[in-house]
Amino acid sequence: YKERIKTTEPRLAIPFFSEEGKLTGLTLRDYGNSTLRYIMVKIVDDAPTIFGLDCISKEKPVRIVEGPLDSLFLDNSIACAGTAFNKIIPGDNDIIIIDNQPKNKEVCDILHKHISKGHKVVIWPDNIEQKDINDMIMANLDVEEIINYNTFQNLEAELKYTSWRKC
């Protein structure tokens, strides 16, 4: 896998493990302003690119977010890297938490796909300006409370989504 890393700038290495604790890959996150913020290095080619599988309890609702760093701020959370968000099938009580990017068509499409399938989703309120959970934490927002009050499903999710999206 070393030959796949074509960068020399310092990066944060975020390990991905299987449910059994086996290392399956790494995400290398840029510290600066590189146009390539993330580099995914798969060690096990057919393993899902889901961060936190080794740390969750399936007995409780799982919160499914986009970024590994975001998942560290939430109890019982995993992060889907790359195209894994399109492949994940949440359980009945799991919650999809997409970044707060109502102008991003790809984000809107992923969120709407999950709403259409009846999954529980977070629709960020209009007063939240931050893009992701990490930014919300840095702004001293109570992310747990925001998630609890803004998790929707079915018709209510569709209605909230229609007013949230700008794409």
Model-derived segments and their meaning:
Residues 36, 59-62, 67-167:
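TOPRIM fold recognition
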Residues 1-93, 107:
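Phosphate-handling DNA/RNA-contact segment within nucleic-acid enzymes
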